């Protein structure tokens, strides 16, 4: 590796603000903020809006947005066209 061209790899404190959960993860992210963690050490700090602790897919709180499949919706929408064509023949 060439010296001086790679970012510093260090332990960073990530905070999921939606779930109020902290993660200590090795990262190269650049941040000016720092925060003291529960272990008494000060780490670089990054606030997150969503993480695995608050995302609906990972928490099991995912809501089903479609009540029926795309094919069933298509058939329901165009069912009257098929019956009208048969009656005309």
Swiss-Prot record:
InterPro entries listed in its UniProt record: Ribosomal_bL28/bL31-like_sf (IPR034704), Ribosomal_bL31 (IPR002150), Ribosomal_bL31_B (IPR027493), Ribosomal_bL31_sf (IPR042105)
A GO cellular component annotation in the UniProt record: ribonucleoprotein complex
Keywords of the record: Ribonucleoprotein, Ribosomal protein
A Pfam family recorded for this sequence: Ribosomal_L31
Top-rank taxon: Bacteria
Keyword ATP-binding: no
Single GO molecular function: structural constituent of ribosome
Listed GO biological process terms: translation
Assembly and interaction partners: Part of the 50S ribosomal subunit.
Family: Belongs to the bacterial ribosomal protein bL31 family. Type B subfamily.
Record-given protein name: Large ribosomal subunit protein bL31B
Naturally occurring in which organism (per UniProt): Pseudomonas fluorescens (strain ATCC BAA-477 / NRRL B-23932 / Pf-5)
Gene that encodes it: rpmE2
